[in-house]
C-alpha cells in the first residue's frame, strides 16, 4: 500500500501539496505515482518565474516505463525548483515526500487549496481506481 501522509493535500492526477511558510506550496508526486512510473531516469523541471495554471501540465518526468506530465495543483508562480533532481532523479522514487519534492509555487489564491483532496479522499480515489 502506498504511503499517504495525512498532513498533505492531493490532486486527482497524483500530485501532493504541502503548505510551506508565507503561504507558499511545495509540490511533488505521490508515492502511488512513483510506484506506477517505476525507476525515474530524467525530469524536465519548470523554470523559476513561470506562471502555471491549475490542472495544466507544467513539467515532465521520464521513467524506464513511460514519460508522464506533472500538473500544477493550483494557479501561481514557480518560485523554486529542486535542482538536486537533475543529477539524482531517483530521489523521487526513494523519498517522494521529502528530498524528492519537485517545485515550490506561490499560489494566486490560497482558497484554491480547498478543492484539493485530503488524505482520505485520495486514498478512496486510489482504491476506486483498483
From Swiss-Prot:
Gene3D superfamilies (alphabetical): 2.40.50.100
Residue intervals of the Lipoyl-binding domain: 24-106
One cellular component term from this protein's GO annotations in UniProt: cytosol
Cofactor(s) essential for the protein: (R)-lipoate
Pfam families assigned to the protein according to its UniProt record, in alphabetical order: GCV_H
Family per record: Belongs to the GcvH family.
Protein name, entry field: Glycine cleavage system H protein
Amino acid at each position: 500500500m502506498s504511503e499517504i501522509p495525512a498532513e498533505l493535500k492531493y490532486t486527482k492526477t497524483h500530485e501532493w501539496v504541502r503548505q510551506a511558510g508565507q503561504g507558499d506550496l511545495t509540490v511533488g508526486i505521490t508515492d502511488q505515482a512513483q510506484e506506477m512510473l517505476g525507476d525515474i531516469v530524467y525530469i524536465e523541471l519548470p523554470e523559476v518565474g513561470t506562471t502555471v495554471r491549475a490542472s495544466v501540465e507544467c513539467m515532465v518526468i521520464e521513467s524506464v516505463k513511460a514519460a508522464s506530465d506533472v500538473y500544477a495543483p493550483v494557479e501561481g508562480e514557480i518560485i523554486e525548483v529542486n535542482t538536486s533532481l537533475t543529477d539524482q532523479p531517483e530521489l523521487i522514487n526513494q523519498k517522494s515526500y521529502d528530498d524528492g519534492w519537485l517545485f515550490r509555487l506561490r499560489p494566486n489564491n490560497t482558497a484554491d487549496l480547498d478543492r484539493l483532496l485530503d488524505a482520505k479522499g485520495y486514498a478512496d480515489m486510489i482504491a476506486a481506481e483498483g
